[in-house]
Amino acid sequence: METARIRLDETTYYSLLGLPFGASELHIRKAYMRLARELHPDKSKSKEAAELFKVVAHAHSVLTDKEKRLKYDRQLIAKGLHTYVSNSSSSLNYKPPGSRPVTRAQQAAVAADKERAAKKAKPYEEQPYGFGTEAESSPQAGDGTPQRSTTATKPFKAKSYQHQRNPGTPPETGNKKSSTFSARFISNSVPAAPESKPSDEYPAKKMPRKQATPEPSSSPFLSPDHRHYARTKFESRRRGTRSASPLKTMPTSQTDTLDGLKSIINKFSDRVKVNIFGSPSTVETEHVTDLSEDQSSVEQDGGDEARLRADMLAGDKATARCAPIPQDGTKEINLEELNTSLPPQRETFNMRNVSDTLDRMNVKRQKLNTEATHVPGNIPLPAQRHLSPALDESGSLAEPVNKSIPRVYKIDRIPPTEFAMDLSVSDIELPTMPSFHCNILDKSDIKLCREKILEFNTKANRLKKQLIQALSLRSSADEALENRVVRVENMAAYVEAKNYDLDVVMKLHEIQNRQRIVAESFTNLMRSAYASGTF
């Protein structure tokens, strides 16, 4: 191509390369390489081509640099040239990917795909599917290669296979269902001659069923399914039940339980005394008497079984009352008082009442009674282990034996006065900043502004001293209360004190900020006054 025919649109760098605004770096490089091959001084000897190559190289350097290109794009947008499209012959070299021409080979391939996709319509029964449905390839007219001759096999069709039946098997006469058998699918086999066998012998190779007379069954179930269901239900119900304890089945009441517990405790105490001070003969006689008493109590319990059952049934409405069994040598228990002190039956016991009662009690450490715990030295060691309950029956379970009573948590609240918080600090009003609207050419106005600034600084310094003193008192109080403020009852007051400290610091910061603003404004005012020649 001759250089005289090259005409470049130098309106923009994009139009110079024959590209639209916003072209990619790949298209910019391709356009530059195309123009460089034509305009390079080594390829063309004209001076005009050399000048154009410099312009094209400069445009390429700007558009390939990201920062320069971004700056240049902003200039084009500001001037409205980002929508400019060149109409010269150079702009025709840029073709977007979607504007490429379609070749004849591509058109032929699309037409072949359409012909291959079209299928000839066939009835549903004749449409091939399953095994052996591959169509035989027929030799084409223009193809010179001979095709391999294969024997035509009959394709497998599920519909025709479904309707092919054995003609020798007669259909059932009782079957009234509709059949999809059609005359189109007739088997090619020759029908067999009708047999002369009677119908009673059909089907062959099978013995006729014996019609047995139903015998009356002794089972209460109608069928094995009913029997299996009943057995399964019985087994699951039996496994779900829990074994009943003999103590639960025996009816008892509150009075019987307390009397039995008292008798057991008395027997243990008597046996301990006998082992320590008695003889083996007395122990044996006492053991025999205990057995007789147990037998008599069992007989008495068996005789009163009906009465105990009645008491259990009426336990929700009223509590059964029974006279205690008197015993010699023991202290009688008033069952009415026990019934009033014990919780009622079938009612949830509230542990909060116990906790409140323990909180109200003032537990004090008591001295151990050394005389009561003294044990003679001639008593054997096994007897000493069981000696304390028998020797000291009047002792209380609340008294310490070998353990010290744990200390009760004592509340130590700090009064608000010990935190050294001056509540009047929150009502302090900060001084207002003076105005600097004065004539810098008038000395009297400048002196008046100076007096206002001095008065403002005096008030601000006085307030700062007061706030700093409050902070020093608070720090001293925190050092004195260092171990007490971390207790649970003082945490709320401790947080309130820290909020007070923050409020004082914020006021101090605001005063400092106002003084800084006033100082800067006055400095600027005096500079302007000195610059104007007032002083």
Curated annotation (Swiss-Prot):
Gene Ontology BP annotations: cellular response to misfolded protein; chaperone cofactor-dependent protein refolding
UniProt keyword Coiled coil present: yes
Compositional bias of kind Polar residues: 135-153, 176-190, 242-256
Localization: Cytoplasm; Nucleus
Keyword Chaperone: yes
SUPFAM superfamilies (alphabetical): Chaperone J-domain
Residue stretches making up the J domain: 12-76
Keyword annotations: Chaperone, Coiled coil, Cytoplasm, Nucleus
Biased composition (Basic and acidic residues): 112-125, 224-238
Region (Disordered): 87-256, 284-303
Coiled-coil region: 446-499
CDD domains: DnaJ
Any single Gene Ontology cellular-component annotation: nucleus
PROSITE patterns the record matches: DNAJ_1, DNAJ_2
GO terms, molecular function: Hsp70 protein binding
InterPro entries membership: DnaJ_domain, DnaJ_domain_CS, DnaJ_subfamily_B/C, J_dom_sf
Name of the protein described by the UniProt record: J protein JJJ2
Native source organism of the sequence: Eremothecium gossypii (strain ATCC 10895 / CBS 109.51 / FGSC 9923 / NRRL Y-1056) (Yeast)
